[in-house]
Design a protein with these regions (language model features):
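The feature marks the mature, well-folded catalytic cores of soluble enzymes
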Residues: 1-371
Length: 371
Protein backbone atom coordinates (compact mmCIF):
# COMPACT_ATOMS: atom_id res chain seq x y z
CA UNK A 1 0.00 0.00 0.00
CA UNK A 2 2.93 2.33 0.59
CA UNK A 3 3.85 1.99 -3.09
CA UNK A 4 4.09 5.54 -4.52
CA UNK A 5 2.75 6.85 -1.17
CA UNK A 6 -0.74 5.88 -2.33
CA UNK A 7 -3.10 6.25 0.61
CA UNK A 8 -6.52 6.82 -0.98
CA UNK A 9 -7.95 4.28 -3.46
CA UNK A 10 -11.41 2.69 -3.49
CA UNK A 11 -13.59 2.01 -6.54
CA UNK A 12 -16.32 -0.26 -5.21
CA UNK A 13 -17.91 -1.76 -2.09
CA UNK A 14 -16.24 -5.19 -2.12
CA UNK A 15 -12.56 -5.18 -3.16
CA UNK A 16 -10.12 -6.09 -0.32
CA UNK A 17 -10.30 -3.38 2.37
CA UNK A 18 -6.92 -2.19 3.67
CA UNK A 19 -7.59 1.21 5.31
CA UNK A 20 -10.81 2.51 6.84
CA UNK A 21 -12.22 5.24 9.08
CA UNK A 22 -14.35 4.01 12.00
CA UNK A 23 -16.58 6.55 13.76
CA UNK A 24 -16.74 7.54 17.42
CA UNK A 25 -19.75 8.01 19.72
CA UNK A 26 -18.23 10.77 21.89
CA UNK A 27 -20.66 13.60 22.62
CA UNK A 28 -23.36 12.43 20.22
CA UNK A 29 -26.59 14.41 20.54
CA UNK A 30 -30.18 13.75 19.65
CA UNK A 31 -30.67 16.82 17.44
CA UNK A 32 -33.34 19.42 18.12
CA UNK A 33 -36.33 19.54 15.75
CA UNK A 34 -35.56 20.95 12.29
CA UNK A 35 -37.31 20.66 8.92
CA UNK A 36 -35.32 17.76 7.44
CA UNK A 37 -35.38 15.74 10.63
CA UNK A 38 -39.03 16.03 11.56
CA UNK A 39 -39.98 14.20 8.40
CA UNK A 40 -37.53 11.40 9.14
CA UNK A 41 -38.73 10.64 12.69
CA UNK A 42 -41.85 8.42 12.64
CA UNK A 43 -44.89 9.80 14.46
CA UNK A 44 -44.82 7.05 17.11
CA UNK A 45 -41.06 7.26 17.72
CA UNK A 46 -39.63 7.82 21.20
CA UNK A 47 -37.31 10.38 19.57
CA UNK A 48 -40.07 12.95 19.02
CA UNK A 49 -39.65 16.02 21.22
CA UNK A 50 -36.41 14.70 22.76
CA UNK A 51 -33.06 16.37 22.13
CA UNK A 52 -29.68 17.00 23.70
CA UNK A 53 -26.69 14.84 24.64
CA UNK A 54 -27.11 11.09 24.80
CA UNK A 55 -26.49 9.56 28.22
CA UNK A 56 -22.94 8.73 29.30
CA UNK A 57 -23.66 5.03 29.77
CA UNK A 58 -25.02 4.67 26.22
CA UNK A 59 -22.09 6.65 24.79
CA UNK A 60 -19.58 4.52 26.71
CA UNK A 61 -21.23 1.30 25.51
CA UNK A 62 -21.32 2.48 21.89
CA UNK A 63 -17.66 3.51 22.06
CA UNK A 64 -16.72 0.15 23.54
CA UNK A 65 -18.37 -1.60 20.58
CA UNK A 66 -16.80 0.76 18.02
CA UNK A 67 -13.38 0.29 19.65
CA UNK A 68 -13.81 -3.50 19.59
CA UNK A 69 -14.79 -3.35 15.92
CA UNK A 70 -11.70 -1.23 15.18
CA UNK A 71 -9.48 -3.73 17.00
CA UNK A 72 -11.00 -6.62 15.06
CA UNK A 73 -10.31 -4.85 11.75
CA UNK A 74 -6.73 -4.09 12.81
CA UNK A 75 -6.19 -7.77 13.66
CA UNK A 76 -7.27 -8.51 10.09
CA UNK A 77 -4.44 -6.27 8.87
CA UNK A 78 -6.66 -3.28 8.08
CA UNK A 79 -5.40 0.17 9.08
CA UNK A 80 -8.03 2.04 11.12
CA UNK A 81 -8.29 5.80 11.59
CA UNK A 82 -10.76 7.60 13.85
CA UNK A 83 -12.38 11.06 13.58
CA UNK A 84 -11.86 13.94 16.01
CA UNK A 85 -15.19 14.66 17.74
CA UNK A 86 -16.37 18.25 18.22
CA UNK A 87 -18.39 19.55 21.15
CA UNK A 88 -21.68 18.61 19.50
CA UNK A 89 -23.82 19.96 22.35
CA UNK A 90 -23.65 23.59 21.29
CA UNK A 91 -25.77 25.81 19.04
CA UNK A 92 -24.55 26.43 15.50
CA UNK A 93 -25.76 28.95 13.00
CA UNK A 94 -25.34 30.52 9.58
CA UNK A 95 -26.93 33.79 8.40
CA UNK A 96 -29.98 31.67 7.41
CA UNK A 97 -30.69 29.48 10.43
CA UNK A 98 -29.74 28.37 13.93
CA UNK A 99 -29.59 24.77 15.23
CA UNK A 100 -29.68 24.04 18.96
CA UNK A 101 -27.24 21.10 18.77
CA UNK A 102 -25.14 19.19 16.28
CA UNK A 103 -25.30 15.41 15.81
CA UNK A 104 -22.07 13.37 16.16
CA UNK A 105 -19.40 11.51 14.19
CA UNK A 106 -20.33 7.86 14.50
CA UNK A 107 -21.30 7.41 10.81
CA UNK A 108 -18.48 8.66 8.53
CA UNK A 109 -20.17 6.88 5.60
CA UNK A 110 -22.84 9.63 5.60
CA UNK A 111 -20.28 12.40 5.10
CA UNK A 112 -17.39 10.99 3.05
CA UNK A 113 -17.51 9.41 -0.40
CA UNK A 114 -14.33 7.78 -1.71
CA UNK A 115 -14.13 7.37 -5.48
CA UNK A 116 -10.71 6.24 -6.68
CA UNK A 117 -8.09 8.64 -5.29
CA UNK A 118 -10.69 11.23 -4.25
CA UNK A 119 -12.52 11.71 -0.97
CA UNK A 120 -15.54 13.98 -1.41
CA UNK A 121 -17.32 15.70 1.47
CA UNK A 122 -21.09 15.51 0.90
CA UNK A 123 -23.34 18.57 1.20
CA UNK A 124 -25.48 16.91 3.93
CA UNK A 125 -29.14 17.87 4.16
CA UNK A 126 -29.60 18.37 7.92
CA UNK A 127 -28.70 21.66 9.56
CA UNK A 128 -27.44 19.79 12.64
CA UNK A 129 -24.90 18.01 10.42
CA UNK A 130 -23.64 21.07 8.50
CA UNK A 131 -20.34 21.19 10.42
CA UNK A 132 -19.80 17.44 10.78
CA UNK A 133 -17.11 17.41 8.07
CA UNK A 134 -14.79 19.17 10.55
CA UNK A 135 -14.42 15.89 12.49
CA UNK A 136 -12.71 14.36 9.45
CA UNK A 137 -10.57 17.28 8.35
CA UNK A 138 -7.49 16.26 10.42
CA UNK A 139 -7.50 12.87 8.67
CA UNK A 140 -8.14 14.28 5.20
CA UNK A 141 -5.41 16.87 5.69
CA UNK A 142 -3.00 14.08 6.65
CA UNK A 143 -3.92 11.94 3.62
CA UNK A 144 -3.55 14.98 1.36
CA UNK A 145 -0.11 15.81 2.76
CA UNK A 146 1.18 12.24 2.41
CA UNK A 147 -0.44 11.13 -0.86
CA UNK A 148 0.53 13.36 -3.82
CA UNK A 149 -2.34 11.99 -5.93
CA UNK A 150 -5.09 12.27 -3.31
CA UNK A 151 -7.91 14.66 -4.22
CA UNK A 152 -9.75 16.22 -1.30
CA UNK A 153 -12.99 17.70 -2.61
CA UNK A 154 -15.98 19.32 -0.97
CA UNK A 155 -19.37 19.80 -2.61
CA UNK A 156 -20.85 23.33 -2.39
CA UNK A 157 -22.17 23.90 1.12
CA UNK A 158 -25.95 24.31 0.86
CA UNK A 159 -27.77 27.20 2.52
CA UNK A 160 -30.48 24.87 3.91
CA UNK A 161 -33.05 27.64 4.17
CA UNK A 162 -36.72 26.78 4.67
CA UNK A 163 -37.02 26.72 0.86
CA UNK A 164 -35.08 23.43 0.88
CA UNK A 165 -37.90 21.59 2.67
CA UNK A 166 -41.59 20.94 2.08
CA UNK A 167 -43.62 22.22 5.03
CA UNK A 168 -46.45 19.77 4.40
CA UNK A 169 -44.14 16.89 5.25
CA UNK A 170 -43.98 17.89 8.91
CA UNK A 171 -47.55 17.18 9.98
CA UNK A 172 -48.16 14.43 12.54
CA UNK A 173 -51.48 13.81 10.80
CA UNK A 174 -49.86 12.25 7.72
CA UNK A 175 -50.02 8.47 7.96
CA UNK A 176 -47.78 5.82 6.45
CA UNK A 177 -50.19 5.17 3.56
CA UNK A 178 -49.88 8.77 2.41
CA UNK A 179 -46.12 8.72 2.90
CA UNK A 180 -45.81 5.61 0.71
CA UNK A 181 -47.85 7.35 -2.01
CA UNK A 182 -45.50 10.31 -1.78
CA UNK A 183 -42.32 8.23 -1.98
CA UNK A 184 -43.68 6.24 -4.92
CA UNK A 185 -44.28 9.50 -6.78
CA UNK A 186 -40.81 10.73 -5.67
CA UNK A 187 -42.30 13.54 -3.60
CA UNK A 188 -39.82 13.91 -0.75
CA UNK A 189 -39.17 16.30 2.14
CA UNK A 190 -36.34 18.01 0.26
CA UNK A 191 -37.11 20.32 -2.65
CA UNK A 192 -34.93 21.08 -5.69
CA UNK A 193 -33.84 24.47 -4.34
CA UNK A 194 -30.12 23.52 -4.46
CA UNK A 195 -27.96 20.38 -4.76
CA UNK A 196 -28.25 18.15 -1.68
CA UNK A 197 -26.77 14.71 -1.06
CA UNK A 198 -25.51 12.49 1.74
CA UNK A 199 -22.61 10.22 0.81
CA UNK A 200 -24.50 7.19 2.21
CA UNK A 201 -27.03 7.45 -0.62
CA UNK A 202 -24.30 6.50 -3.11
CA UNK A 203 -23.00 3.02 -3.97
CA UNK A 204 -19.85 2.54 -6.03
CA UNK A 205 -19.78 -0.10 -8.76
CA UNK A 206 -16.54 0.80 -10.56
CA UNK A 207 -17.45 3.02 -13.51
CA UNK A 208 -21.05 3.28 -12.31
CA UNK A 209 -22.43 5.16 -9.31
CA UNK A 210 -25.90 4.14 -8.10
CA UNK A 211 -27.59 6.91 -6.12
CA UNK A 212 -30.82 6.84 -4.12
CA UNK A 213 -33.17 9.76 -4.76
CA UNK A 214 -34.96 10.27 -1.45
CA UNK A 215 -35.12 12.37 1.72
CA UNK A 216 -31.41 13.20 1.91
CA UNK A 217 -30.44 13.36 -1.78
CA UNK A 218 -32.35 15.34 -4.39
CA UNK A 219 -32.16 15.33 -8.20
CA UNK A 220 -29.98 18.44 -8.22
CA UNK A 221 -27.57 16.62 -5.92
CA UNK A 222 -27.48 13.65 -8.28
CA UNK A 223 -26.89 16.00 -11.22
CA UNK A 224 -24.02 17.68 -9.34
CA UNK A 225 -22.39 14.27 -8.77
CA UNK A 226 -22.88 13.41 -12.46
CA UNK A 227 -21.09 16.59 -13.51
CA UNK A 228 -18.38 16.17 -10.87
CA UNK A 229 -17.55 12.53 -11.71
CA UNK A 230 -17.81 13.04 -15.45
CA UNK A 231 -15.98 9.81 -16.30
CA UNK A 232 -18.57 7.81 -14.36
CA UNK A 233 -22.10 6.79 -15.31
CA UNK A 234 -24.61 7.88 -12.69
CA UNK A 235 -27.91 6.07 -12.12
CA UNK A 236 -30.71 7.45 -9.94
CA UNK A 237 -32.74 4.77 -8.15
CA UNK A 238 -35.65 4.85 -5.74
CA UNK A 239 -37.37 2.29 -3.54
CA UNK A 240 -41.14 2.91 -3.40
CA UNK A 241 -41.75 0.65 -0.37
CA UNK A 242 -39.82 2.90 2.03
CA UNK A 243 -41.85 5.68 3.71
CA UNK A 244 -38.63 7.24 5.07
CA UNK A 245 -36.07 6.82 2.24
CA UNK A 246 -32.76 7.87 3.70
CA UNK A 247 -29.41 6.25 2.81
CA UNK A 248 -29.24 3.29 0.46
CA UNK A 249 -27.19 0.90 2.59
CA UNK A 250 -30.05 -0.71 4.54
CA UNK A 251 -31.98 -1.25 1.30
CA UNK A 252 -29.60 -2.28 -1.47
CA UNK A 253 -26.25 -3.88 -0.58
CA UNK A 254 -23.64 -5.17 -3.04
CA UNK A 255 -21.84 -8.20 -1.59
CA UNK A 256 -19.40 -8.97 -4.39
CA UNK A 257 -19.18 -8.63 -8.15
CA UNK A 258 -22.45 -9.92 -9.61
CA UNK A 259 -24.48 -10.07 -6.38
CA UNK A 260 -26.67 -7.56 -4.54
CA UNK A 261 -29.04 -8.18 -1.63
CA UNK A 262 -32.20 -6.03 -1.72
CA UNK A 263 -34.60 -5.25 1.11
CA UNK A 264 -37.77 -7.27 0.28
CA UNK A 265 -39.97 -4.46 1.60
CA UNK A 266 -38.24 -1.91 -0.65
CA UNK A 267 -37.57 -3.67 -3.92
CA UNK A 268 -35.78 -1.92 -6.75
CA UNK A 269 -38.45 -1.16 -9.40
CA UNK A 270 -38.51 -3.44 -12.45
CA UNK A 271 -37.33 -0.83 -14.95
CA UNK A 272 -34.33 0.03 -12.73
CA UNK A 273 -33.33 -3.65 -12.40
CA UNK A 274 -32.60 -3.83 -16.13
CA UNK A 275 -29.07 -2.42 -15.74
CA UNK A 276 -28.20 -5.29 -13.39
CA UNK A 277 -30.03 -8.07 -15.22
CA UNK A 278 -28.59 -7.12 -18.62
CA UNK A 279 -25.09 -7.47 -17.18
CA UNK A 280 -25.55 -10.80 -15.40
CA UNK A 281 -25.97 -9.43 -11.88
CA UNK A 282 -28.23 -11.22 -9.43
CA UNK A 283 -30.46 -9.21 -7.08
CA UNK A 284 -31.84 -11.36 -4.27
CA UNK A 285 -34.08 -10.57 -1.31
CA UNK A 286 -32.14 -9.99 1.91
CA UNK A 287 -32.89 -12.26 4.85
CA UNK A 288 -35.35 -11.04 7.46
CA UNK A 289 -34.00 -9.01 10.42
CA UNK A 290 -33.62 -10.82 13.74
CA UNK A 291 -35.40 -7.99 15.59
CA UNK A 292 -38.96 -6.65 15.37
CA UNK A 293 -38.09 -3.17 16.59
CA UNK A 294 -35.02 -0.91 16.45
CA UNK A 295 -33.09 -0.19 19.68
CA UNK A 296 -34.34 2.71 21.88
CA UNK A 297 -33.86 6.27 20.56
CA UNK A 298 -32.75 5.00 17.15
CA UNK A 299 -33.51 6.66 13.79
CA UNK A 300 -32.84 3.56 11.75
CA UNK A 301 -35.16 0.68 10.88
CA UNK A 302 -34.74 -3.00 11.78
CA UNK A 303 -33.18 -3.40 8.33
CA UNK A 304 -29.76 -2.36 9.63
CA UNK A 305 -29.50 -6.17 9.56
CA UNK A 306 -28.31 -5.80 5.94
CA UNK A 307 -25.99 -2.86 6.69
CA UNK A 308 -22.93 -5.10 6.42
CA UNK A 309 -19.28 -4.29 5.79
CA UNK A 310 -17.64 -6.36 3.06
CA UNK A 311 -13.92 -6.87 3.79
CA UNK A 312 -13.21 -8.67 0.50
CA UNK A 313 -15.23 -10.71 -2.03
CA UNK A 314 -15.22 -13.71 0.32
CA UNK A 315 -15.51 -12.05 3.76
CA UNK A 316 -18.23 -9.93 5.33
CA UNK A 317 -18.89 -8.43 8.77
CA UNK A 318 -22.49 -8.89 10.01
CA UNK A 319 -23.96 -7.64 13.29
CA UNK A 320 -23.68 -10.46 15.82
CA UNK A 321 -27.40 -10.76 16.63
CA UNK A 322 -28.49 -10.78 12.96
CA UNK A 323 -28.48 -14.57 12.64
CA UNK A 324 -30.73 -14.78 9.56
CA UNK A 325 -28.60 -12.35 7.55
CA UNK A 326 -25.47 -14.22 8.66
CA UNK A 327 -26.98 -17.58 7.61
CA UNK A 328 -27.94 -16.22 4.20
CA UNK A 329 -24.48 -14.82 3.49
CA UNK A 330 -22.88 -18.04 4.74
CA UNK A 331 -25.01 -20.03 2.27
CA UNK A 332 -23.92 -17.63 -0.47
CA UNK A 333 -20.33 -18.72 0.16
CA UNK A 334 -19.15 -15.81 2.29
CA UNK A 335 -17.07 -16.13 5.44
CA UNK A 336 -19.18 -14.26 8.01
CA UNK A 337 -17.50 -12.37 10.85
CA UNK A 338 -20.00 -11.58 13.63
CA UNK A 339 -19.53 -8.11 15.14
CA UNK A 340 -21.50 -6.82 18.12
CA UNK A 341 -22.79 -3.33 17.29
CA UNK A 342 -26.53 -3.19 18.01
CA UNK A 343 -26.10 -0.98 21.10
CA UNK A 344 -24.36 1.59 18.87
CA UNK A 345 -27.07 1.63 16.15
CA UNK A 346 -28.80 4.64 17.69
CA UNK A 347 -25.64 6.73 17.21
CA UNK A 348 -25.86 6.61 13.44
CA UNK A 349 -26.29 3.14 12.00
CA UNK A 350 -24.67 -0.23 11.41
CA UNK A 351 -21.36 -1.69 10.27
CA UNK A 352 -21.40 0.00 6.85
CA UNK A 353 -22.61 3.35 8.24
CA UNK A 354 -19.95 3.56 10.95
CA UNK A 355 -17.10 3.15 8.46
CA UNK A 356 -15.76 4.98 5.41
CA UNK A 357 -13.30 3.49 2.94
CA UNK A 358 -9.85 5.01 2.56
CA UNK A 359 -8.13 2.21 0.62
CA UNK A 360 -9.36 -0.91 -1.09
CA UNK A 361 -7.16 -2.91 -3.42
CA UNK A 362 -8.22 -3.01 -7.06
CA UNK A 363 -8.61 -0.71 -10.02
CA UNK A 364 -11.42 1.00 -11.89
CA UNK A 365 -13.49 -1.60 -13.76
CA UNK A 366 -16.64 -1.59 -15.86
CA UNK A 367 -19.15 -3.98 -14.27
CA UNK A 368 -22.05 -2.90 -16.51
CA UNK A 369 -20.70 -2.81 -20.10
CA UNK A 370 -24.18 -3.41 -21.58
CA UNK A 371 -26.10 -0.14 -21.28
Amino acid sequence: MSQNNKIVNSWNEWDPLKHVIVGRADGTCIPAPEPALDAKVPEDSDMRGTYGPRTKDTVDKANELLDNFSNLLEKKGIKVDRPTPLDFNQPTSTPDWKAETMFGCMPPRDVLLTVGNEILEATMSYRCRWFEYLCYRPLLKDYYNKDPNMRHESAPKPRLTDADYRKDYLSDKIGVTKRLEWTESKYFVTTEEEPLFDAADILRFGKDLVIQHGFTTNLKGIDWIKRHFKDHRVHAVNFPGDPYPIHIDATFTPIKEGLVINNPQRRLPKEQRKLFEDNGWEIIDAAQPAHNTPPPLCYSSVWLSMNVLVLDPKTVCVEKSEKYQAEQLDKLGMEVIPVELRDAYAFGGGLHCCTADVYREGTLKDYFPKQ
